Amino acid sequence: MAETTTKDDKPLFGRPWIFIRGVPSMKFLPPEGPAEIAFAGRSNVGKSSLINALVGHKGLARTSNTPGRTQELNYFVPDGYSGEADDLPPMALVDMPGYGYAQAPKEQVDAWTKLVFDYLRGRSTLKRVYVLIDARHGIKKNDEEVLALLDKAAVSYQIVLTKTDKIKAAGVPRLIAETLDKIKKRPAAYPEVLSTSSEKGAGIEDLRITIEQAVAR
């Protein structure tokens, strides 16, 4: 008799993914249960593009050249799951609002900031946060503030360098070494820095592997 394959048996990144909801405040969060992997970073660092590259669906997470476009916690899950309590997925990816965007109204920025900080501090199913850093700029003050928050909340995080195709290839190892040096004393930082290019596909498979490992823990 042939074995029956269920939707739970498929590889996490070997299937289509869908958007299930945008969360403007904590009360709209989906039921806790599946492992959650979140992506944080400055506005226009490339979070949406990276998520699209991860799942192999260019139009899944909306991308924009306008900083501050993502204003909610956007949830993505493997296709075939609703994300409701009776149909929980094996994992969810969470695209968080970008920080450090000075052009938005202060009230709006404050609301985004509170949402992100409340989520990071209070979500028990959050397995890891990937903090995206633009390879052209390195770690900035806003990034350091977020890393400090994650350290304080004891939320595991890993640095991902984005847009590495925009700098000289010889500069990538040096940037990785400099970044590792900056985070070596941070208690919640995962001691490995990933380098990626959503446009070229570089480092995407390595990122998938680390996500699967984080979810399995």
Curated annotation (Swiss-Prot):
Record-linked SUPFAM superfamilies: P-loop containing nucleoside triphosphate hydrolases
Boundaries of every EngB-type G domain copy: 33-217
Pfam family, one: MMR_HSR1
Highest taxon of source: Bacteria
Binding site for GTP: 41-48, 68-72, 95-98, 162-165, 196-198
Keywords: Cell cycle, Cell division, GTP-binding, Magnesium, Metal-binding, Nucleotide-binding, Septation
One BP term from GO: division septum assembly
Signal peptide positions on this chain: none
InterPro entries in the cross-refs: G_ENGB_dom, GTP-bd, GTP-bd_ribosome_bio_YsxC, P-loop_NTPase
Binding-site residues, Mg(2+): S48, T70
Names of the cofactor(s): Mg(2+)
Any one GO molecular function term: GTP binding
Cellular component annotations (GO), alphabetically ordered: cytosol
Family from the record: Belongs to the TRAFAC class TrmE-Era-EngA-EngB-Septin-like GTPase superfamily. EngB GTPase family.
Classification via NCBIfam families: GTPase_YsxC (TIGR03598)
Name of the molecule in the record: Probable GTP-binding protein EngB
Name of the encoding gene: engB
